[in-house]
Amino acid sequence: MKFFTDLLPVLLFFGAYWLTRDMFVATGVAIAATAVMVAWAWFKHRKVDTMQWISLGLIVVLGGATLLLHDKHFIMWKPTVLYWVMGAGLLISEFAGKNGLRLMMGKQIEMPDPVWRKLTWAWSGFFAFMGALNLFVAYHFSEDVWVNFKLFGGMGLMLLFVIAQSLFLAKYIEEKK
């Protein structure tokens, strides 16, 4: 359920864009949807995940700049900044001696430290790649292509990467009896 609620602002952005073909309307919808998502998380759980706060901050700042300056490039940077923040966060936690992935998944998977490090570097590299790829698509293709890439390309590549990581991690995942 959390995955769907986190994805909802992206889906509403996509829907608003394809209904209106207006990046500014879609941006306003994404800002509102993200604010509602964070408010709902707070109302329901009395807690908001760090990534939801970061996403809200980015959409308000970059989406707000898009609307105020009437420049779509600010909103096009949002996925890149989010990917790079996530990748940097993983690396910073690794260098600080607290593997971020282990903190998130350590209860489900028991692995040696070198494997956690490899996984952290793989995810950080993937996020760096995705951020750069988003900018490449944003600046070298049409607005329509970028909007489609934001939903389908980004999600498709993420799914492929998760499958590849799952195959790598399969030997460490214990079956529940």
Curated annotation (Swiss-Prot):
It holds the Pfam family IspA. It is a multi-pass membrane protein. Keywords: Cell inner membrane, Cell membrane, Membrane, Transmembrane, Transmembrane helix. It comes from the Bacteria. The chain crosses the membrane at residues 23-43, 50-70, 73-93, 119-139, 149-169. Plays a role in cell envelope biogenesis, maintenance of cell envelope integrity and membrane homeostasis. Belongs to the YciB family. This is Inner membrane-spanning protein YciB.
